[in-house]
Regions:
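Terminal and domain-flanking low-complexity segments
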Residues: 39-113
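Phosphoinositide-dependent membrane-docking surfaces
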Residues: 1-43
Length: 113
């Protein structure tokens, strides 16, 4: 279960079937796989770090958690499209936008990478 009002940042890494969806939320909400955002995580994903720093300037007290979705092969693109259409207040990194374009068929799957 993902509550859209808690989704702060959406990012993707890797490509094609190996795409990983990284979701940063403002609450854990019954999710055992959600872990607190750490410096190591931010160092690994610099695009997420830029958005995260912007959010922390707005609300320094807020604790953020992240979850990485690795399973699901190409179904992750459908999931990403659903997140994009329902979580309108979330920040999306440029990599996530490119993956959403693939999900919507605006970019041919073979053109990327």
């Amino acid at each position: 279960i993902i509550l859209c009002e808690n989704v702060a940042i959406v990012h993707t890494s890797k490509e094609r079937e190996d795409v990983e969806i990284i979701i940063v939320t403002s609450s854990k909400f019954r999710n055992k796989k959600a872990r607190p955002v750490t410096k190591g995580f931010l160092k690994k994903y610099p695009e997420v770090e830029r958005e995260y720093n912007r959010l922390k300037k707005i609300n320094e007290e807020q604790t953020y958690y992240f979850q990485i979705i690795r399973n699901g092969s190409l179904r992750k693109y459908i999931f990403l499209e659903n997140i994009y259409t329902t979580c309108v207040k979330s920040a999306y990194t440029p990599a996530a936008i490119e993956s959403i374009k693939i999900a919507r068929g605006q970019i041919n799957f073979n053109e990327r990478g």
